[in-house]
Amino acid sequence: MAKIIVNNENKKSTIAPEIYGHFSEHLGRCIYEGLFVGENSDIPNVNGMRTDVVDALKEMKIPVLRWPGGCFADEYHWMDGIGPKEKRKKMINTHWGGVVEDNSFGTHEFFELCRQLGCKTYVNGNLGSGTVREMSEWVEYITFNGVSPMADLRKENGHEEPWTIDYFGVGNENWGCGGNMRPEHYADEYRRYQTYVRNYAGNQPINKICCGPNVDDYEWTKKVMATCFDHCEPRFHGQMDGLSLHYYTLPETEEDWNIKGSATKFTEDIFYQTLKRGYFMEELINRHGAIMDEYDPDKNIGLIVDEWGIWSDVEPGTNPGFLYQQNTMRDALVAGMTLNIFNKHSDRVKMACIAQLINVLQSVMLTDGDKMVKTPTYYVFHMMRHHQGAALLDSSLVGGATVGSGKNELPKVFESVSEDKDGVITVTLTNNSLESSEDVDIMLTNEGDKYSVSEARYIEGAMDAHNTFEAPEVVDEKDFTAYENTQTGVKVTLPACSVVTLRLSK
């Protein structure tokens, strides 16, 4: 029997709620049809935002939403997306399908969506094709509470009060679609552009996110950190609050992006290969984090994993540029495993945004007209929401088995444990095995307190189990009963291919 030893007297870092963040780009049917249907739609909506989607995201406790991209961000000119919708300029979405973007969802709509969701805002600026002035004026338009050209324009467009920008990305993937820049050049551009991302609110600072590496480009991290810290007072920690990291899990091949593998039809070998590639996130955090430690030992700069998840082939018959893919228990296990990894590294990882929110890549929901279905990944985020803002507890797995074989071998069980402000302990676990359940003895080292299970939920299913509009509850969150309270904690039996959440109360 595997054991999880929990030192519930050793509270470590706080798990930032933003680790459970999401990403919405003008790509495929993420914004249009997914989130936004317009005020005149027959689909129930509030100010154009789908009611069913907003309600489900609030239930999931979405903490932060990133917009407008992605690669789209570095060709997006924000002034095209304000004012009367019938007068907004159209553009070609060159990155994603070559479709016409009518800009009916712009700045006002994004902040209205976040208001309805009750979540923080992460705006990604255009460094690749935009100007310093354009970026500066966007921040002024959004946040300045006074008399100025941009504030006056915002008021003319119907919003008297300013909004709050919680996070601002100064460019996106500038090593690639955001300008194909060298790290030193981007870092110099970052230093210049971020200067004009001004804090107009005073008591509400904007957290500035610097474009970090693609996957394992450790040289990018070194050179960007070195350039940003050069001739910079230590108290400004490189003029950044976060450094982004992008990593997608490709199921079938990592050499040819044209052969990523099916989202629903795969072998057991590909299943374990996918999980092992998802597990690579741990190494990426450790190695990029070690470089960041050289410049920022106090961890003032968060590692911001603002694009992650499984990227598979699109569903047959759909636009290849729309990145619409199904979502199975394989996705759920990668999500649960990855979120547990983020929790364990919450001293450095301060935000993460799975790609993407709806109808694109590893989304939490899919829509078709007025129909909406929750994916297995949705339920993982819903079950693990209790970690948001809680204190990470020191925990370790002892005697755990492995699954897969050869280069695809990885731990059978992943876990993380936290305690919230009310003293409730949350334990989240994944069983990555397709063949066997796993008995786990969760032992709390503080013998003075007696805990018992107050809530237990789980999802399970075949590796390719997924929800459709015709069968929306093939994978569904249910009460978990395979546990026994003990003198030191709780013993559980994790079903094969499952994600489990336990809540322990005194």
Where are each of the predicted segments found?
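Non-catalytic accessory regions flanking glycosidase/transglycosidase catalytic cores in CAZymes
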Residues: 1-242, 281-282, 286-506
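Long, well-ordered, tryptophan-enriched scaffold segments
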Residues: 216, 230, 239-258, 263-267, ...
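Beta-strand-rich domain onsets/edges
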Residues: 276-277
